[in-house]
Amino acid sequence: YYFHELIQRAQDITFLYNSSTQGSKTGEMSRFMLQLMTEWNHPIHRLTLQAGQEPMHCEAEVVEKNEAVLKRLDEISYFSPTAINTYITCQLKYYFKYIADIKETDEIDVDDVDNRIFGNIFHTAAQLMYEKLLPREVITAKDIDKLLKTGKSTQSLTSGNADLTLDDIVDESFAQELFNQQPGTRKHPKLNGLQLINREVIIKYLHQLLRIDRRTAPLRVIGHEFPVKRPLTIKVNGLEKQIETGGRIDRLDEIHVDSDKARLRVVDYKTGSKVAESLKSVDEMFDPKYLEKKSDYTMQAMLYSLIEATNDMEHNPNHHAVSPALLFIQHAGSEDYTPVLSIDTEEITDVTVYEEDFLRKLTDILEEIHNPDIAFEPTS
């Protein structure tokens, strides 16, 4: 009404709209404009205005390792798998992020759930599910079936969690990761439409995770979200330098409990669409072409597994064999799916078999980062 009242006595009317896209929203003319175009008998002229911009071709420059860069490198004593993968895929990106210390902004839009926040919510929900809804010791197929059927905690009345449901822990995860509430809080602002859809997807993924674990039950979850580190010695200008590498393990579990097949798995949850394929060799984990096309998480999974197999008496006191596992929840529907990594089509049942080759490649990369004669070059 107000729109038509506004234009009813006008002799010349100009409407403008922006057709550019912003995020997931596309610019388009309003329904009022579409109505005028189809119903009016007056002449309508359509013009398209374009900004005469020409993109400038900019070539990234090589950064030489001068005295200031080498001093900064000498100060760095900890190298995460993410940092190492960044160097492998783009040396210049590594320089800007870890030497020049130029960071990306880390803003959370509570009206949106991007891939990073979605992954954080799923990680937290999975951790809470195993801590509050399933037995703390050995988890059987029967326990998992009960949770899948009822959605209710299988823990004892004395645990304090007997009344919790799967919906409760998902709400707690949203409150914690999206709305920055304290752990244990389930109350949060009302979810919008997109957030409600993501909530249903999280629940679906948790059901998928339970069905995957049922195949290897009985199992025991040893820990969630805990840090691991390993010391390394590298050569820099002929001298030894002591550094550390490591990170945080999403989940460490023991499968085939109380059998001769018992072993530990370092499980890394992945909610994205990229999937890790079978490796031909350890060298492929450090190949930028493999990291770009397939998965850049294999080296991280191998490193964490080696730490658990050789350097973690707290979580692996019995020195069980350890397998690296990348659990891509989107691709885990088939009955023969296994998250355990493979090399040359052979499933890795004991990561220490590949320890020598892995540490050799890892050391080579770290020494290359410190080599003053090798500049930081952009990806070709």
Annotated model-derived regions:
Residues Y1-Q8, S24-R31, F79-T82, T86-Y94, ...:
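Generic recognition of stable, solvent-exposed alpha-helical segments in well-folded globular domains
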Residues Y1-R46, T271-S273, E277-E292:
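Conserved C-terminal motor-coupling region of P-loop helicases
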